[in-house]
Structures are given as C-alpha cells and as structure tokens.
C-alpha cells in the first residue's frame, strides 16, 4: 500500500467532517479521528526531538572512532 501524504489525509478528514451532506455521527467520528491523529503526530514529534537531543549528547560524551582496517576484510594486493 502506498503511503498517504499526511497533509492531504488531514485535509481530507477536515473536508469530510465539514460536509453538510454527511450524517452528523459520521462527521463527528471523522473529527475525532483527525484529533487523535494530530495528538499522535505531536507525541511522535516530541519523541523524535528528545531522541535527537539524546543522541547528540551521547555522541559528544563518547565520540565514535572509525578505523579503516576494522572491516574484517583482507585485500588481495597483487
């Protein structure tokens, strides 16, 4: 299944919930779904922000050292 563009999906939910030709209970359900998705996205955004902040802090405390010979491969030199 293709990923839905978040902004387009949100726009669709808003438009459907504002549609006067649709049953009131259905529009209320769509509004609740929209609010729940917004709350979930906000929580995910905050978790990602904290994660990035923590990873930067850890990298500053323990810098990663890359060794060229640490790949475990031997090169055939002829």
From Swiss-Prot:
Keywords of this entry: Phosphoprotein
A Pfam family annotated for this UniProt entry: Chordopox_A30L
InterPro entries reported for this sequence: Chordopox_A30L
Post-translational modification comment from the UniProt entry: Phosphorylated by viral OPG054 kinase.
Phosphoprotein listed as a keyword: yes
Ranges for region Disordered: 53-78
The protein's role, per its UniProt record: Required for the association between the dense viroplasm and the viral membranes to form the mature virion (MV).
Assembly and binders: Interacts with protein OPG092; the interaction stabilizes both proteins. Interacts with protein OPG062.
Family per record: Belongs to the orthopoxvirus OPG157 family.
Protein name: Protein OPG157
Biological classification of the source: Viruses, Varidnaviria, Bamfordvirae, Nucleocytoviricota, Pokkesviricetes
The gene coding this protein: OPG157
């Amino acid at each position: 299944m293709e990923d839905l563009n978040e902004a387009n999906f949100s726009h669709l939910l808003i438009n459907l919930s504002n549609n006067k030709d649709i049953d009131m209970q259905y529009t209320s359900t769509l509004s609740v779904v929209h609010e729940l998705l917004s709350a979930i996205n906000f929580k995910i955004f905050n978790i990602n922000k904290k994660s990035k902040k923590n990873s930067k802090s850890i990298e500053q405390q323990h810098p990663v050292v890359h060794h060229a010979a640490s790949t475990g491969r031997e090169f055939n030199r002829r």
